[in-house]
């Protein structure tokens, strides 16, 4: 039986940049200076890559996000300090 590391490195989609999460008030997410709507089926991932409900998500922090074709937030990843450092290189 193979055992995965407890906190394996996450793979993110290409062409995404770190942004600053400034607030979550379902169904809206404030990222940098813009307010987006969370897409139907949109997912927020915490630093352990678990899906969290919008009301349980941190209100601030560094994130990566992906938009759907309508401009809604489809996926949002809360970043760890290590990921922030790695993406800043």
Language-model-derived ranges and their functions:
Residues 32-44:
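Short, basic/aromatic beta-hairpin or loop at an interaction surface
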Residues 2-35, 50-89:
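Short, flexible, surface-exposed loop segments at domain boundaries
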């Amino acid at each position: 039986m193979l055992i995965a590391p407890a906190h394996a490195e996450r793979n993110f989609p290409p062409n995404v940049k770190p942004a600053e999460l400034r607030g979550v008030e379902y169904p809206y997410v404030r990222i940098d200076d813009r307010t987006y709507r969370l897409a139907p089926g949109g997912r927020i991932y915490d630093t352990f890559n678990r899906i969290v409900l919008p009301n349980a998500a941190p209100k601030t922090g560094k994130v990566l996000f992906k938009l759907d074709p309508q401009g809604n937030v489809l996926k949002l990843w809360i970043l760890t300090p290590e990921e922030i450092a790695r993406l800043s290189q």
